[in-house]
Amino acid sequence: IDTLLWLGRAYFYSGSFLNSKDSYLEYQSMGQDHPKFADSLYELSKVLIELDENVQAKLLLDKMLTEYPGHTLSSKASALLQNL
């Protein structure tokens, strides 16, 4: 399952945003119990912003901040949300 997360990251940094989105969505479909699930919400929101899917990105960031308020990426997610 971690492979999908890393694949999503690799696609993102190579500019293959649609492939990145697909990898993150497949990763997330495997369940919220994985320790990196909150990370994937934040990272997928960045992909969606690149694809001009800002409404969906906002929803993911809101979900992340609501369900994982103490997460290490919460401040970055909050800042990203404010800039949308």
Predicted regions and their residues:
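Short solvent-exposed coil/turn linkers within tandem alpha-helical repeat scaffolds
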Residues: S29-K36, L65-A77
